[in-house]
Amino acid sequence: RIYQKMGDWNEPNAMRWMIAVTASWSLPQIFAFTIYSRDMFSYYGQGMVMAHGLNPYKHGVSEISNFMQNGADPMWAESPPPYGPVSLKLEEWIVRLAGENIDLSLFYFRLLSVFAVIGILFYVAKLAQAHGFNQVRALWQIGPNPLFIASFIASGHNDSLMTMFMLGGLYYAKRYRDTWWGGPLGVTFVALGVAVKPLALVVLPFVGLLWAGKNASWPRKFIFWVLSGVLLLAEMALMGWATGLEFGWIKALSTTGGQYIWYTPFGLVIGAASLFVQGDAFEVIRKLIETVGKGI
């Protein structure tokens, strides 16, 4: 029915309908209880750790009074967060702004996610236009997507902020690839994404290619890949110094690899192994499967 209202992708009303649908489906989620994830409660706990002058890479949320009642998942209570310095600093600022009130903090985390979602939609539209694709059609795959809304607004995941910076880096590197500053600007956005969640690093090679320019030779591509890596490393060092967290996020990358969830592919394999092997032999097999999973 909504598609019928939109009509052709190129009609003037199509964009208005796309925005209206996305907004109407997203707005209630801003005020709803968090669903599908307890990550925002962990963000609050990490913000509390920061607000009390502790390094979250060395001190888990379990050191904060009443952390269990505040909703943080006990699975990660003593684990360093797999997030970068920008994410942790934003968590601290939000907790301080909310006066350490958990309900208000969660609402502010939601607002930050809404800001990031708007940024994602903006950059998707710009990238679609830059590559000759219909903006409305590109946005339709993302904006009104229930999984997108549930993960980035209802659950308030910081992946939304990371994704916004990743897309911003690609867009500015593409948009200003003929200038001397387009590539560095793209790398800076990727660095901000990495400083939220290190997974953003996967787009750095593509930003390096855009910085190298059209029809670049392989030696030139490698040179700009190296330049991109050096610039990102320098910017990460600067952000680590400014926040006092340095490169603690590198060691924390193994945090999620130390646990497994039963319904994930490797969790299912480990669960199946537990049906046939017990005791020390099972621990050996479990560690082997976890090592393979980390490698992949």
Language model regions located:
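Short helix- or helix-capping micro-motifs
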Residues: 22, 138-144, 190, 194
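Short helix/loop segment immediately N-terminal to the Walker
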Residues: 104, 108, 179-185
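Membrane-interface alpha helices of multi-pass inner-membrane proteins
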Residues: 149-152, 169-172, 181-208
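N-terminal hydrophobic segments of proteins, predominantly signal-anchor/transmembrane helices
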Residues: 23-31
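Catalytic and binding regions of secreted/periplasmic enzymes and modules that target cell-wall glycans
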Residues: 46
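Primarily membrane-embedded glycan-assembly and transfer machineries that use lipid-linked glycans
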Residues: 1-19, 31-37, 49-140, 146-155, ...
